[in-house]
Amino acid sequence: KEIILGFLKEGIKSMVFFEGRHDAHLETILELPRGWGIAYFEKTDIRKAKEVLKDHTCIMGGVPISLIVSGTPEKIDTYVKELLEDVKPGGGYILTTSVGIAPRETPLENIRALANAVEKYGKY
């Protein structure tokens, strides 16, 4: 918290990667000033994060990398559509995978399906 506040005092916003599950601790993020930066969640329920943090904090994540690696393009499309219907209203959401890089064995058609679904459903 002290580091984030120090950066913010200098006009620098932060992006914090919350590794693991933080569902039980989301309220502690509300101790930071509104608009402090971006909370990138790995395994935290992104819908719960949006419900708790609302317009206080921009949230990021929500797409399990396992879906991109082993799902089908149809499953990816449906997942993204439903996720965005739930968390897009009000803004403050960046859709991305729960980890930054897809493994080498990720099917290219699944990466395309993710990009296409974002184009189709993700515009504000």
PLM feature spans:
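Active-site loop segments of alpha/beta catalytic cores
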Residues: 1-124
